[in-house]
Structure formats: structure tokens, C-alpha cells
Amino acid sequence: MQIDLCIDKEKSSTEKGRILEHLVAQLLTIQQYEVVETIRVTGMEIDVFAKHKINNSTLLVECKAWESPLPADVISKLLGNVVLRHADQGWLVSTGPLSKDAKGIKSEWENKNDAERAMLSFYTNDRILDLLLNSGKIISSDQVKKKLESKYFADDITLMLTEKKYYWVVPILNNQYGTVSYKMYLMQQMENVLMILIY
């Protein structure tokens, strides 16, 4: 499954990053963190800074709303910032794919012992979707399919994030006419289904 961030055409691409930062801030708030979005400190900009309300652990989050593969140096830079700022953890949250080198670093890092591995966490599409499901922010794509009552779904279901709402975009194949229609399913209002036919 894919996650797309959608903004008005008049807005800059930095707005996509803000949507992702805001989403991460909401998820961290649920997990008992006090959150500050986009702060500038000497020599760096931090997308999301969070401090846990109970154990006072600190977290730096780098949010990347990129469509192209994320280069490995983004991971190195985040890890350096975590060390320089004496943070307890760093999160890399990316809606796009990781480059080959970045995948290699992620794999190496996730094979470290628990104490080392806890310093850096990677959240790509599957893990972001898990966080959203577990926090109750979205319902599963399977639940959406049941509501839409169609037998012919295409595989490329997408979660579309906008500034205010989240939608599942579900391609439905029409075997009779050889067309694909898209149903957008609004997360906050389960009865509100919009259908757009594409010929």
C-alpha cells in the first residue's frame, strides 16, 4: 500500500512535509509526548522534537515526504543530530522508498543489539500505516473494501493524507466496461463515499 500527501496546487511542496510532521506530532501526543514541530537550533532544523511526559526521554524526528528514493545520508545526518543534541532516540519517517544504500543501513541498524537499535527507528509506509491503525486514526483497507461492496479491487490502494482529513483511495475494476473507477473513502465519516469515474 502507498501513502500520498496531497496539497492545493497553489501551495509549495514544503506543505507536504508539514502534513507529515503534523501527523507524526499527533501520533506522538497519543503516546504521551509533548511535541514541538519544526524548530531551528544551531546548525540544524528539527522537523519534530518530542519529550516524553513520564520518563523525560527526548526524540528527534526527521520527516520526509519524498516520492524519490531517500538517500543514505539522510540517515547519517539524523543519527549525527541525535548524538549532537544528546537525544535519546531518533525517528526517520518517510512516505517514499529508501534508496539501496539506505535500505542497507536500515537493515544493518535493525540487526544491532536492542540497546543500540533503540537509538534510531525507521518508519516507512507499512510501519506508518500500523501506527495509524493502532492509534485509531484510520480503519483498515480491508474494512473499507467491505463497506464498498465490490468484487473487483485493484491492488494499488492508497492512503491519501490532506491537511485536514485522511482518505482511502480504492481502485475498482469494472469488468463490463473495461474501466477503473476510484472510490475515496473519508476516514472520519464512514458513510461519506465519493466515486470518481475515469474513462
Task: Spell out what each predicted region is.
Residues 1-199:
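Mixed-charge (Asp/Glu-Lys/Arg
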